Amino acid sequence: MAPAPPPAASFTPAEVQRRLAAGACWVRRGASLYDLTSFVRHHPGGEQLLLARAGQDISADLDGPPHRHSDNARRWLEQYYVGELRADPQDPTENGAVASAETQKTDPALEPQFKVVDWDKDLVDWQKPLLWQVGHLGEKYDEWVHQPVARPIRLFHSDLIEAFSKTVWYSVPIIWVPLVLYLSWSYYRTLTQDNIRLFASLTREYSMMMPESVFIGLFVLGMLFWTFVEYVIHRFLFHMKPPSNSHYLIMLHFVMHGQHHKAPFDGSRLVFPPVPASLVIAFFYVFLRLILPETVGGIIFAGGLLGYVLYDMTHYYLHFGSPHKGSYLYNMKAHHVKHHFEYQKSGFGISTKLWDYFFHTLIPEEAHPKMQ
């Protein structure tokens, strides 16, 4: 017979208040207590919205307005469970509130799904690297990978390979912005010093001179081109569903994007590591050089590379930043978090919703009335 699980910790209202006074952000759902201190800065609605509810019952907030929290959001909450609220025999004035909390009921149909997360009973062993394990999940992989967890991930046994699979956010501008500046300067000089003609390889008679002013247009075109690449890769490659009988395609999907959906707040896996990024960037450079005149392709590539840098920085900020309510980034953060927690088959734009509008993959608006 398996040993009985240890009893849940319990806290009196006075103990909860002491933690709140020390700066912690505890909330409750009925009599269940959750320590959201480490999650406050990640909350898609902003820090202040969560801090304003410290010490309060959030049961009604989970159902909205402004929106009803998804099943994944409720599972996520359970990872922060710390115990139960209990009466204090030394302070009978608080016991009425405790009794009220204990009698509050949650949806009985949902309650069994959202018990305290038991890492020992998950489909994988979290004490070991995950990559080889996920390939064995088969038909269970797709559901498992879209149930996010609040913990870091290890992919490989080898420390060296593991190091190449992660990076810090600031490696992206440090490595790629100098290359953007160099390419931009180099190709701009080519425009000013050489007689660059468009379509010269096809016909000399109808070829056109390229003035210096075309640089800005081509550079911006490259940035726009990146937003399209971002959308296409995210939708059709990262969100492909690997065959359940293919061990290696499941592993490939997990390396490319599944790991990010499983652990969306693992900061070391939010931006593209330099080594694999170099291979992808080199591919696009060669591709543009092959299909376009060298200078044209080079300028578009430089703009696209800057677009990639802005995309990766935006992506990191959407996960870890706290944009002002009503701002562009605030709306993009809410949009992206919904993609992670509820709408994995829509909302593929990260730096812009442009292509979601164009291809009709916008996340639907909720019908809840606006908060006053």
Curated annotation (Swiss-Prot):
The keyword Acyltransferase does not apply. Heme binds at residues 43, 69. Gene3D superfamilies: Cytochrome b5-like heme/steroid binding domain. Its EC number is 1.14.18.-. Zn(2+) 1 binds at residues 234, 239, 257, 261, 339. It is a multi-pass membrane protein. Zn(2+) 2 binds at residues 260, 315, 319, 336, 340. It catalyses: a 1,2-saturated fatty acid + 2 Fe(II)-[cytochrome b5] + O2 + 2 H(+) = a (R)-2-hydroxy fatty acid + 2 Fe(III)-[cytochrome b5] + H2O; hexadecanoate + 2 Fe(II)-[cytochrome b5] + O2 + 2 H(+) = (R)-2-hydroxyhexadecanoate + 2 Fe(III)-[cytochrome b5] + H2O; octadecanoate + 2 Fe(II)-[cytochrome b5] + O2 + 2 H(+) = (R)-2-hydroxyoctadecanoate + 2 Fe(III)-[cytochrome b5] + H2O; docosanoate + 2 Fe(II)-[cytochrome b5] + O2 + 2 H(+) = 2-hydroxydocosanoate + 2 Fe(III)-[cytochrome b5] + H2O. GO terms for biological process: central nervous system myelin maintenance; ceramide biosynthetic process; establishment of skin barrier; fatty acid biosynthetic process; fatty acid metabolic process; galactosylceramide biosynthetic process; glucosylceramide biosynthetic process; lipid modification. InterPro entries: Cyt_B5-like_heme/steroid-bd, Cyt_B5-like_heme/steroid_sf, Cyt_B5_heme-BS, Fatty_acid_hydroxylase, Scs7. Expressed in brain (at protein level). Detected in cerebellum and forebrain. Expression in the white matter is mainly restricted in oligodendrocytes. Expressed in stomach, kidney, skin and testis. Expressed in sebaceous gland. Residues 8-86 form the Cytochrome b5 heme-binding domain. Its cofactor is Zn(2+). The keyword rRNA-binding does not apply. Binds 2 Zn(2+) ions per subunit that likely form a catalytic dimetal center. It is found in: Endoplasmic reticulum membrane; Microsome membrane. FA2H is stereospecific for the production of (R)-2-hydroxy fatty acids. Plays an essential role in the synthesis of galactosphingolipids of the myelin sheath. Responsible for the synthesis of sphingolipids and glycosphingolipids involved in the formation of epidermal lamellar bodies critical for skin permeability barrier. The histidine box domains may contain the active site and/or be involved in metal ion binding. The N-terminal cytochrome b5 heme-binding domain is essential for catalytic activity. This is Fatty acid 2-hydroxylase. It comes from Mus musculus.
